[in-house]
Amino acid sequence: MADAAATAGAGGSGTRSGSKQSTNPADNYHLARRRTLQVVVSSLLTEAGFESAEKASVETLTEMLQSYISEIGRSAKSYCEHTARTQPTLSDIVVTLVEMGFNVDTLPAYAKRSQRMVITAPPVTNQPVTPKALTAGQNRPHPPHIPSHFPEFPDPHTYIKTPTYREPVSDYQVLREKAASQRRDVERALTRFMAKTGETQSLFKDDVSTFPLIAARPFTIPYLTALLPSELEMQQMEETDSSEQDEQTDTENLALHISMEDSGAEKENTSVLQQNPSLSGSRNGEENIIDNPYLRPVKKPKIRRKKSLS
């Protein structure tokens, strides 16, 4: 009978566990606890004289047993916390059973019954050993003011500053070799840069790019730029020369034009004077005055020189 009930309970739990194949440890723990309760219910049914049981009945009894045990634990925890304790004791469980209407005096006789079935412990499967994580340094223990149930400190390298730097080299020979190699590298880099950006000469006529040499350039006099006029000064000098030339040509053209007009006017005046001799006296007085301002000779402005203080 026990085998039949156990088979029914195991079959139900096996179907349940088979339908929920989970790799989560919490889910596996709940499935194992449920299966253990089903085995206990099957053994109780066998002690009561049942030879077989339906799956729904076994599940209902399992749920009732689980709820009963959960209520005992919850009530014991509440009584424990009311007395300012964190862990329940036997007295808390006894008070809980009494409050739930259970006769505590019948427990010793029930534990010593003759038809008691011994449930063997389930086989323990060796869990795969997880490799330990790589640790750097030694873990720091808790100080006296931190309770032991607090989590441990993480690895020291996660929160302790560990600067990594090389010690400076102080050997004289090593420093000289390092300085020489750096100077040689800088010279090579500068030579390559000058060969790529400037004019070069080659030792071989056939292959120009094999051994490029920097073309020699004559040295310029450093103070020559200060002696030579700048572009702005040259431009100003050119503008001044061009303006003087324009003024000179304008003056020459104006003088030529005036002379031509004077000659024409003299011819006209002579012809008029020959016809009217009375106008000759008044015309001679007006010859020295020019009414047209554009025909007057150019007068340069007077340059005012500053008196030097002696």
UniProtKB/Swiss-Prot annotation:
Residues 297-310 have a biased composition (Basic residues). Its main location: nucleus. Residues 1-30, 262-310 are annotated as: Disordered. Signal peptide: none annotated. Residues 35-102 form the Histone-fold domain. Transmembrane segments: none annotated. Pfam families: Bromo_TP, TAF8_C. GO terms for molecular function: protein heterodimerization activity; RNA polymerase II general transcription initiation factor activity. The keyword Zinc does not apply. The modification Phosphothreonine is found at T130. Disulfide bonds: none annotated. Residues 270-283 have a biased composition (Polar residues). Belongs to the TAF8 family. It is linked to Neurodevelopmental disorder with severe motor impairment, absent language, cerebral hypomyelination, and brain atrophy: An autosomal recessive disorder with onset soon after birth or in early infancy. Affected individuals do not show developmental progress, are unable to sit or walk, do not acquire speech, have poor visual fixation, and show poor overall growth associated with feeding problems. Additional variable features include seizures, spasticity, and joint contractures. Brain imaging shows hypomyelination, thin corpus callosum, and cerebral and cerebellar atrophy. This is Transcription initiation factor TFIID subunit 8. It comes from Homo sapiens.
